[in-house]
C-alpha cells in the first residue's frame, strides 16, 4: 500500500473553500425559506477583490405569474439607519463648505433643539419633571450620538412619557414625531442612540436652504453617478416597480410579508436618520469612495477624521457598558458583543482586531440598518463590505451568521492575495 500523503491546504484553496461554503450557506437559507433573499458585495482598495452575489428573491409574495422576483444589485431597498452614514457625509460636506463647524453651538441653526429641556422623571402625581439643559449641543454631538437625545422606544423614561400621553403616536409618517421627545441627558455626558441624525438633517437643510433630497442628489449622487438613491420613493415610479418588500420573521421562524408604511408613504420631510432608499450597488459606491479617499465626496483629511475615535475614555466606557448590557439591540451587528468599541463620525470603530488577522482589523468602521443591513470599511486591510437583507427584526441570528460567514470569506481572499 502506498504511503498516505498529507495535503497541506494553501491560502488559495482555503479561500476558495470559504467562498464556496459561504455561497452554499446563503443558497441553503433561501431554499429552506430562512431568508427571502440577500445581496453581498466587497471591494478592495487595490481592485483585486470585486465581489458581488445576489441570492433569492426580493419578496415572499409571488407575482401574477406565481414567480418570486429576484433580488438584484439594483433592487431599491429601505436603508433604515444605514441612512445615517449618508447624512453624516452631507454634514461633513457642509463643514468643508464653511457652512457649519463641528464644534459650534447648533443654536444658530437649531434653536428648537437648543431650547429643549431634559426629562428627569415623574412626580407622585405622574407629572413630568423637566430641567434646563447644561452645556451646548454641537454638531459633533449629533454625529456621535452624545447629544443627550434618545429614541423613545429605547429609553424607559421616554416610554413612560409616551404612555402618559405626553407624546402622541404620529398619524402620519412625519419627522416631527422623531424630533418631539425631550432630551434625557446633557450633551457630552453619555452615548445614547437617538434621533441625532434626523436633527443633523434639519441642520443641513437650514444651513443650505434646500431639503436633504436636493442636497444629496447634488453632493452624493451626481459625483458618484448614482441614479437610484432617494428620500422620496413615491415620486420614483421606476424604483417603486422594482423595490424590495419588507419581510418579517415570525416567532416560529417562518417568514411573512410586512406591509410597511415606509413603502406606501413618503415621510412628510426627509429623515436624515432613516429615510433613504437605494440599490446595493449604489450604496457600495459610497463605501468605496470613502475607502479609496478619491475626493468625490469628502477630502482625505475629513475621511480620516471619520475613522478617529471620537469618544474619550469615560464616554467610551459608558458606550461599551450600554452595548454590553443590551445585547438584544446589538448596535455592532457582526461585531463580537464583548469587544472594545468606540464611535467615529458615521459608525462604530473596532478598537481591536477580530479573530486575529482573519477578520476585521482595529480601526474598521461599521454600522447598519434595521432590515439586517451591515456595512463596514476596513482602512488597515483596504476592504469594504456590504450585506443587505430586507428582513426584520434587527439582529436576526440567521442573518448575523450569514453576514459573518460572508465577511470572513472575503477576508480569506485578502490573505490569499497578500
UniProtKB/Swiss-Prot annotation:
- Induction of synthesis: Expression is induced at the beginning of the stationary phase, which is consistent with the timing of compactin production. Expression is controlled by the ML-236B/compactin cluster transcription regulator mlcR.
Catalytic center residues: 81 (acyl-ester intermediate)
Its top-level enzyme class, in one word, is transferase
Q: What biotechnological or industrial uses does this protein have?
A: Compactin (also known as mevastatin or ML-236B) and the intermediary metabolites Ml-236C and ML-236A are inhibitors of HMG-CoA reductase involved in cholesterogenesis. Their hypocholesterolemic activity might be useful for lowering cholesterol levels in the blood and reduce artherosclerosis and coronary heart disease.
| Catalyzed reaction equations | ML-236A carboxylate + (S)-2-methylbutanoyl-[2-methylbutanoate polyketide synthase] = mevinic carboxylate + holo-[2-methylbutanoate polyketide synthase]
Q: What is its EC number?
A: 2.3.1.-
What are the recorded GO MF terms, alphabetically?
A: acyltransferase activity; hydrolase activity
Cleavable signal peptide: none
Q: Which residues bind monacolin J?
A: 78, 178, 193, 262
Assigned keywords, A-Z: Acyltransferase, Hydrolase, Transferase
Pathway field of the UniProt record reads: Polyketide biosynthesis
Q: What does this protein do?
A: Compactin diketide synthase; part of the gene cluster that mediates the biosynthesis of compactin, also known as mevastatin or ML-236B, and which acts as a potent competitive inhibitor of HMG-CoA reductase. Compactin biosynthesis is performed in two stages. The first stage is catalyzed by the nonaketide synthase mlcA, which belongs to type I polyketide synthases and catalyzes the iterative nine-step formation of the polyketide.
Similarity-based family = Belongs to the class-A beta-lactamase family.
Q: What is this protein called?
A: ML-236A carboxylate methylbutanoyltransferase mlcH
- Species in which this protein is naturally found: Penicillium citrinum
- The gene from which this protein is expressed is mlcH
